[in-house]
Amino acid sequence: GGGTYITFIDADDWVDSDYLEVLYNALIDENADISVSTYKRFHMADNCWYIHSFQRGYEKRVFTNQELIDEFIDLDTFDYSYRYVCGKLVRKCLLDKIAFNEMTTLGEDMEFWLKLYLISNKVVFVNRDSYIYRLDNVDRHFGLEKIRSDIQQRLNFIAFLAEDTPPFSFSK
């Protein structure tokens, strides 16, 4: 596309009518490279909404890339907003440097976003569940080969992170 920003919406998901407005305003207000929002889930099997709200006490939070990487494990423990491809708006110029790892068939979102966070200057989180993640039959997505591939790709990514080569230095 010819735009300045990119968002990803899965074909079977949907978003609130002000989804892009919320993400765009946060990105512009904070002069960030990436804006992240949270999500709610709709399970097709039981026709129910599942809403989580783990990050209480603030409407918006701003991170440098190093701050986000340092807190990623804690943040990801309760809320997958930072790892999923959905619910974000990104400056398109960052995507010229990073692509999805097509060898990974499960969990490729997290690797992709960690790489983007590493090359971003600032990330803003908006505590708003404007993305609706639709779940149908979860079991069909998790075969043994996909799990093996995912484990191997995560090990490869850990090795990449351990290299500690510029510009991705993790030394304090």
Q: What is each residue range found by the language model?
A:
Residues 6:
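Short aromatic/hydrophobic "clamp" motif used to bind/position activated sugar donors
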Residues 9-11:
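Catalytic metal- and UDP-sugar-binding loop of GT-A-like glycosyltransferases, i.e.
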Residues 14-107, 111-123, 133-149:
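Donor-binding/catalytic cores of nucleotide-activated saccharide
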Residues 125, 129-172:
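C-terminal subregions of glycosyltransferases and related glycan-biosynthesis enzymes
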